[in-house]
Design a protein with these regions (language model features):
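Short, polar/flexible loop-turn hinges at active-site or ligand-entry regions and domain interfaces
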Residues: 51-54, 77-87, 104-118, 130-143, ...
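P-loop NTPase Walker
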Residues: 1-112, 116, 241, 278, ...
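Helicase P-loop NTPase motor core
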Residues: 24-25, 31-37, 311-313, 320-429, ...
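ATP-hydrolysis module of ASCE/P-loop NTPase motor domains
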Residues: 84, 107-201, 205, 314-320, ...
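Short glycine-/polar-rich loops that comprise or flank the Walker A/P-loop
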Residues: 51-55, 84-86, 277-280, 286-288, ...
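Conserved helicase C-terminal RecA-like lobe
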Residues: 453-710, 714-721, 739
C-alpha cells in the first residue's frame, strides 16, 4: 500500500520524506509544486509533528496562490481523515510581514491605525514627487540627453525623461528598502563620499520626500512591510522566539522570486534548524522561470545558492505532465543551447538543469499524434500589423474546430496585447485578456479623454472633429454623412458654429452646399457640444457623469464611467492643485495600458479552463503559472529577445539617453560604490550598462522558456521586423527553428 495516499510521482514522493533541516528543490514547469507542497504540509500535520498551538507556515507569491494552497491542503487533510482547516497558515510574503507588523506597530514607529497604500496610490505619490524633483533639477535632462533633432528633443523633455525619472526613483526606493536603508542613512553616507554620484543623489532626494509624504499620511507601501517586519523581529527577541515556536516548519513556494530582505525575514523565522531539530525550511522554485529580476528586487541566484551551499537535501521535481513530448524536447533544447552554445559566455548560466522529463518515455514519432508536428516556428518576416492579422486568421480557422480547447496569444508588453485584442474584436472572435487594464476600460478612458481634451481647448477644430466622429458617432464613423460632417468640422470656425445666438439663416449660410442629412448631423451635434461646454465648471466627477450618457449606451460602460469618475474625484481631492490637463493625462495613461486601474483584475485566480473556445491574450509575465492547449508566442525578434550580438538593441537603453546608457544600471552601480567603497573603488560610467545587457539577455532567455512551456499540445512562434523594419529573428528562434526542422526530417525519433 502506498504510504502517501496522494497519487504522487516518484520525484514528488522524495519530498514527502522530509522531516527537518533545510531542503532546496528545483522544479520544472508543470512539476506540480503546489500539489506536492500542500501534500507535504498535510503529511507533517498527519504525523503529529506539531504541538496544539503550532502551525505549518506556507509562504507564496500571490493572493490567488494562497487560496489555491489552502484549498489543496484542506483536500489532502480530508483524504487523511483529519479536520481540513487546522494546523497551517498560508500567506503571501507581504501578507506575512503585515501580520507581524500589525501586532506591534508602535515598535517600528507606526500608529496602530497605519494604512498600506496600494500600488495605484503609492505610484501616484511617487510620480508627483519625481516630477517636482525634475522641475527643480532641469540640469538632469541636459546631463543625459542624447543627440536628437529638435522635435525628438522636445518629445523627450515633455514625455520620456519625466517617465524615466519616475521609473528610476521606483527602482532606487525598492532597492534601498530591500537593503533596509533609510533616506537618513543614505544621506549620511553621501556626505562622506568624495565621488560624484548624481543618480544616487537624485534617488536619495526623491526617496526622502516620498517617505516624508507617506509618513505624513500615516501610511506605508508594500516595500516597507518586509523591512519593518525585519526591524521589529530583530529588536524584539521575545516576539521572534514566539513566532519561531508557532511555525516550526516553513514551506516557501516560488522561491526564485524572493528578494534579499524577504529571504532574510524567513531566515529569521526559521532560526537554527538541522535534520534532527524537528524544525525545517523547504524552498521550492524554478530559477529558469525567474522573469522579474530587471523590474523588481527579485534575485534568482539566492535560491540557486541556497540549494548549492545550504540545503541538507536537494531533490528535484523534474517530471512534468503539462506539455506533450515535442514541446518538452524543444524547451530542453533551449536549455542545452544556452548552456553550451550561447554566443555570450556570461549568459550561459541563464538556464540550468533540471531538464524536463515527460511522464511518457515513448520515443517521439509522427504516429504518436502529438510530437514535433504540432510545433510551428514561422520564419516569415512579418510587419507588426501583419503578424497580428496572421495570428487572427489562424485563430479564425482553429477556434470553430476546437470549441472545447484552450488557447492563448502571448505578447511581450501590454500595448501589443491591446493591438491583438482590438483585432480579435474586429474579427468577431471571443477574447479575454490578462493585461494591465481591460479593453473596455481602455476604450472608456480614451473616449472620456478625447471629450475632455476638446473641452480644455474648445477652439481646436481638429480635436472638435475627432470628438464628433471618433467619440460621439463612433459606431457610425465610417458612414458617408458622418465622414462629411467630420470633414466640415475639421475646418470650421468653432466659435461661430457654437455661438448661442446665430440666426437660422446664419447656420444655413455656414452649411451652404452640404447635403440635408449632413446639415441635420451638424445641428444635432451642435446641441450636444453646447451642452457639454456648459458643464466645464463642474467638478471632474460630475462632469464625467454628465457626459457619460452621451458617450456610452450599455449598463457596463455606464458603470465603468461611474468608477472612473469616482477615481478621478479621489485623485483631484488628493491633488487640489491639479488642473484638468493633469487628470486627462491620467486617463491617457489608463487608455494606453500604461497604468493599472481600479483593481488587479482577473489575473488573481485566473483559470484558463473557464475560457474554452475563447482566445486569452496575455503578457508572458502574466501567463506564468498558467497553461493552454494551443499557444501563440509572438514578437520573438532580436529586439524583444536580444542575444548581445551586433545590431541587437536593449529596452533598458532608452533612445533619448546619450551613449547607450542604462540609467537604472548606472544608478545601482553608483549605489554599490556608495555602500561598498572597498569593492567598488571608483565609479566608471558605462561599465554597469554593458553588464546590464548581459543581465537583460539572461532574463529574456528565461522569458522565452516560460512562454514555450505554457503550451500543452500545440505551439506557434512568430516574429516581426518592428516599426523601423530593422528587427530580425531572435537568435534562439533561429536555433530552435533549425533544430526542429532536423527533428521533423528524422521523423522525430529522439526522446524528449
Amino acid at each position: 500500500m502506498n504510504r502517501f495516499p496522494f497519487g504522487l510521482r516518484p520525484s514528488q514522493e522524495a519530498i514527502l520524506r522530509f522531516r527537518g533541516g533545510k531542503m532546496g528543490v528545483a522544479a520544472v514547469p508543470g512539476a506540480g509544486k503546489t500539489y506536492v507542497l500542500s501534500a507535504l504540509a498535510a503529511h507533517l500535520i498527519a504525523e503529529k509533528r506539531l504541538e496544539p498551538h503550532q502551525e505549518i507556515l506556507i509562504v507564496t507569491l500571490t493572493n490567488s496562490a494562497v487560496e489555491n494552497f489552502s484549498t489543496r491542503i484542506a483536500q489532502h487533510l480530508r483524504t487523511l481523515g483529519l479536520l481540513p482547516r487546522l494546523g497551517y497558515r498560508v500567506r503571501t510574503l507581504h501578507g506575512l510581514a503585515h501580520d507581524i507588523v500589525r501586532e506591534k506597530p508602535e515598535k517600528v514607529g507606526l500608529d496602530e491605525r497605519f494604512t498600506i497604500l496600494d500600488e495605484f496610490e503609492a505610484g501616484r505619490i511617487l510620480r508627483e514627487v519625481a516630477m517636482q524633483w525634475l522641475m527643480q533639477h532641469p540640469e538632469f535632462i541636459e546631463n543625459y540627453m542624447g543627440e536628437l533633432n529638435a522635435e525628438r528633443e522636445r518629445e523627450a523633455r515633455r514625455e520620456y525623461f519625466p517617465a524615466a525619472v519616475e521609473k528610476l526613483a521606483l527602482a532606487f526606493i525598492r532597492t534601498a528598502k530591500d537593503l533596509r536603508l533609510t533616506p537618513e542613512r543614505l544621506r549620511e553616507r553621501l556626505e562622506n563620499q568624495p565621488q560624484s554620484l548624481p543618480l544616487v543623489e537624485m534617488g536619495c532626494e526623491i526617496y526622502a520626500e516620498y517617505q516624508r509624504v507617506l509618513n505624513y499620511r500615516g501610511g506605508v507601501d508594500f516595500d516597507d512591510l518586509v523591512r519593518l517586519a525585519l526591524d521589529l523581529l530583530e529588536s524584539d527577541p521575545g516576539y521572534l522566539k514566539r513566532l519561531q515556536d508557532r511555525w516550526p516548519f516553513v514551506l516557501e513556494d516560488e522561491a526564485q522570486d524572493s528578494s534579499r530582505s524577504q529571504e532574510a525575514l524567513l531566515r529569521l523565522i526559521v532560526g537554527d534548524v538541522s535534520p534532527s531539530s524537528g524544525r525545517g525550511w523547504v524552498r521550492v522554485g524554478d530559477p529558469n522561470q525567474a522573469i522579474y529580476e530587471t523590474f523588481t528586487t527579485a534575485n534568482p541566484y539566492l535560491l540557486r545558492r541556497f540549494i548549492a551551499e545550504e540545503a541538507d537535501e536537494r531533490p528535484t521535481l523534474s517530471e512534468s505532465g503539462r506539455s506533450q513530448p515535442g514541446i518538452v524536447a524543444l524547451a530542453n533544447r533551449l536549455i542545452q543551447w544556452v548552456m553550451q552554445e550561447h554566443p555570450l559566455p556570461e549568459a550561459r548560466d541563464a538556464l540550468q538543469p533540471p531538464f524536463i522529463r515527460p511522464l511518457s518515455e515513448e520515443p517521439l514519432t509522427p504516429l504518436t499524434g502529438w510530437g514535433f508536428q504540432a510545433i510551428y516556428l514561422q520564419s516569415k518576416r512579418y510587419a507588426p500589423e501583419e503578424e497580428v492579422k496572421e495570428v487572427v486568421r489562424s485563430l479564425k480557422r482553429w477556434l470553430p474546430q476546437n470549441p472545447d480547447r484552450t488557447v492563448a496569444v502571448l505578447v511581450t508588453d501590454n500595448r501589443r496585447g491591446g493591438h491583438f485584442m482590438e483585432a480579435l474584436r474586429q474579427a468577431g472572435l471571443p477574447a479575454v485578456e490578462l493585461l494591465r487594464t481591460s479593453q473596455t476600460t481602455r476604450t472608456a478612458a480614451s473616449l472620456l479623454a478625447e471629450a475632455l481634451e476638446w473641452l480644455e481647448q474648445p477652439t481646436n477644430a481638429k480635436s472638435f472633429s475627432e470628438v464628433y466622429q471618433k467619440v460621439w458617432r463612433r459606431s457610425e464613423e465610417k458612414e458617408e454623412r458622418v465622414k462629411a460632417a467630420a470633414g466640415w468640422l475639421r475646418h470650421c470656425d468653432v466659435i461661430a458654429y457654437l455661438s448661442p445666438f446665430p440666426a437660422e439663416s446664419d447656420l444655413e449660410e455656414q452649411f451652404a452646399g452640404l447635403p440635408p442629412e449632413v446639415q441635420d448631423e451638424l445641428r444635432a451635434f451642435r446641441q450636444v457640444a453646447r451642452r457639454w461646454q456648459a458643464l466645464t465648471l463642474l467638478p471632474v466627477d460630475q462632469l464625467i457623469l454628465t457626459l457619460a450618457p452621451d458617450l456610452f449606451t450599455t449598463a457596463a460602460e455606464l458603470a465603468l464611467a461611474h468608477k472612473i469618475a469616482r477615481a478621478l474625484a479621489q485623485i483631484a481631492g488628493q491633488h487640489p492643485d491639479w488642473q484638468l490637463p493633469d487628470l486627462i493625462r491620467e486617463l491617457r495613461l489608463i487608455a494606453e495600458n500604461e497604468r493599472r486601474f481600479l483593481s488587479p483584475g482577473m489575473e488573481d485566480g485566473f483559470d484558463p479552463e473557464a475560457y474554452k473556445g475563447k482566445v486569452v491574450v496575455a503578457t508572458i509575465h502574466k501567463a506564468k503559472g498558467l497553461e493552454w492547449d494551443r499557444v501563440y508566442v509572438t514578437s520573438v525578434s532580436n529586439y524583444e529577445f536580444p542575444s548581445g550580438e551586433e545590431g541587437d538593441t536593449f529596452r533598458s537603453e532608452e533612445w533619448f539617453v546619450r551613449d547607450g546608457l542604462s540609467l537604472q544600471a548606472e544608478m545601482l552601480e553608483q549605489l554599490n560604490c556608495l555602500l561598498h567603497p572597498e569593492e567598488y573603488h571608483v565609479y566608471e560610467e558605462g561599465v554597469a550598462s554593458r553588464r546590464a545587457r548581459v543581465d537583460y539577455v539572461r532574463e529574456r532567455l528565461r522569458l522565452l522558456y516560460v512562454a514555450i512551456t505554457r503550451a500543452r499540445r500545440e505551439l506557434i512562434i512568430t516574429w516581426n521586423h518592428g516599426r523601423r523594419k530593422t528587427n530580425i529573428q531572435a537568435l534562439p528562434f533561429a536555433v530552435l527553428k533549425e533544430w526542429l526542422e532536423q527533428m521533423k526530417k528524422q521523423g522525430g525519433s529522439e526522446r524528449a
